[in-house]
Amino acid sequence: MIDLFQKIDFTSHAGLDLTWKIEMDALTPNEWECIAHMIMEHSVPFREAIGIPRGGLLLGKILNRYGTGRIDHPICIVDDVLTTGGSMNEFYRKRHWRNPTQYIGWVVFSRNKPPDWVNTLFQMPITDI
C-alpha cells in the first residue's frame, strides 16, 4: 500500500525542492469517484472536464461524466495537486488560445494560493515562508 502523504525530498514538476509529497497514486478508484462527487457539490455546472497530464487525467475523465455539454457553460480544467499554479495557467493559456471560451479550474490539493480562476478542494495553509 502506498502512503498518500510521504515525508520525502523530491523536486516538484515546477522545479521546487520539497520535503513532503502528496502521492495521488495511493488513491483507489472509489476514492477518486468520491473526490469527483465532492467537487460537484461545490462546482458551478460545466460543459466538459479536461485533465492536465498526468495527474489530472483520471479526475478529468470522471468529472467529464458530469459535463452538461452546454456551450454556455465553462470548460473545467482539473489537476490533482497544485504547487505553483504554473501548470494550470499554462494549460489554460494553450486551451484558451485554441478555444476562446470561459474556463474554471479545480484541483484536489493546493500547496499554495491558486490562481483566481482555480477552485481547491483541500487547501494547505498559505505562508510567506
Q: Which stretches of residues belong to each language-model region?
A:
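PRPP-associated nucleotide enzymes
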Residues: 1-129
